């Protein structure tokens, strides 16, 4: 593993993609398992023996009560040690700041050892921090593997530089890893920003770009764009394993949103298969969405129960501080969920 890590520092993204293309699915699992990439925000992700999840409490109208209800349920089932992260409907600075303050208040009241994030544009989050004093544990941005692709996201490196500087000066985390990036094969092709290169190479370039900012979280949203770029479950599975391997070889702490769209030839069993393979490969985290059905983004991914089930199957635990918090709350005991798990009313009794 040390030799791989040393060699990876000299690899360009194009070489990382080239290596990936030579490998079978089992090769991708076997090699990725050898590579541990950890990062620290408020807690440390990626340590041996751990497996984490992002709690994704999305809501169709950003209703505070609906969002917090999802947060309560997810936490009670052991989700959220990677981050509590919302994709907002309303991308206004005021709304983003309001949700961040709500997350922070809840986190502090219940002493939850995790990170909070609202996945708005980097400039919106920066303004929310500077103008409204919004508490920011992580700065999020979707990124692409070319300048033109990032411009399609309304993004350039200077914006990320400013966002990271804001986090290091005003962020509410201990750091030093303060950034969260999402990627996914096909985004550059959908915006005519691939410059003639294939989607695996373009995805690898995303990870090279991400590495510049020493992120805490990076994940591919592997089947989100749909069958135009990943046709069926076989291709989604392959892409998920490719992305995880390439991220690790690049040297970033890699997770995966194992997901699919409704018009793709895939179902929930396929996504659970991919999630299982990713845990075998040493993936840092997956998503947790109520019932695995995101009512706002309109796609399917892993639910609140999957992370706990996979931890039990593979003998893994959440991030240590979060694991201890789950035991203190009575949601888990010796790494297994208790009968109290899933009872969100625990949070309504105090």
Each language-model region and where it sits:
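Anaerobic metallocofactor- and corrinoid-dependent redox/one-carbon enzyme cores
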Residues: 1-70, 76, 81-350
């Amino acid at each position: 593993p040390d030799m791989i890590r040393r060699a990876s520092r000299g690899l360009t993204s194009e070489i990382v993609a080239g290596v990936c293309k030579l490998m079978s699915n089992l090769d991708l699992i076997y090699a990725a398992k050898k590579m541990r990439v950890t990062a620290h925000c408020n807690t440390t992700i990626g340590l041996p023996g751990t497996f984490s999840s992002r709690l994704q409490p999305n809501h169709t109208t950003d209703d505070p009560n609906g969002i917090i209800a999802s947060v309560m349920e997810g936490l009670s089932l052991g989700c959220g040690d990677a981050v509590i992260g919302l994709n907002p409907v309303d991308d206004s600075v005021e709304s983003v700041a309001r949700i961040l303050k709500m997350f922070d208040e809840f986190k502090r009241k219940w002493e939850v050892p995790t990170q909070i994030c609202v996945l708005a544009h980097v400039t919106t989050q920066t303004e929310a921090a500077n103008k409204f004093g919004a508490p920011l544990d992580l700065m999020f941005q979707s990124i692409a593997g070319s300048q033109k692709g990032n411009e399609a996201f309304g993004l350039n490196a200077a914006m990320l530089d400013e966002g990271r500087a804001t986090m290091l000066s005003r962020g509410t985390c201990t750091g030093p890893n303060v950034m969260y990036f999402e990627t996914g094969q096909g985004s550059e092709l959908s915006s005519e920003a691939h410059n003639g290169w294939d989607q695996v190479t373009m995805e690898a370039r995303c990870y090279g770009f991400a590495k510049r900012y020493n992120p805490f979280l990076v994940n591919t949203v592997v089947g989100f764009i749909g069958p135009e770029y990943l046709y069926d479950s076989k291709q989604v599975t392959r892409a998920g394993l490719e992305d995880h391997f390439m991220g690790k070889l690049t040297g970033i702490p890699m997770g995966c949103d194992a997901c699919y769209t409704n018009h793709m030839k895939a179902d929930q069993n396929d996504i659970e298969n991919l999630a299982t393979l990713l845990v075998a490969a040493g993936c840092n985290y997956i998503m947790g969405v109520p019932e695995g059905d995101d009512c706002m983004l309109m796609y399917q991914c892993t639910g609140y129960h999957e992370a706990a089930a996979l931890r039990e199957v593979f003998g893994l635990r959440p991030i240590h501080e979060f694991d201890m918090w789950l035991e203190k709350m009575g949601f888990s005991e010796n790494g297994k969920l208790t009968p109290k798990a899933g009872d969100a009313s625990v949070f309504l009794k105090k």
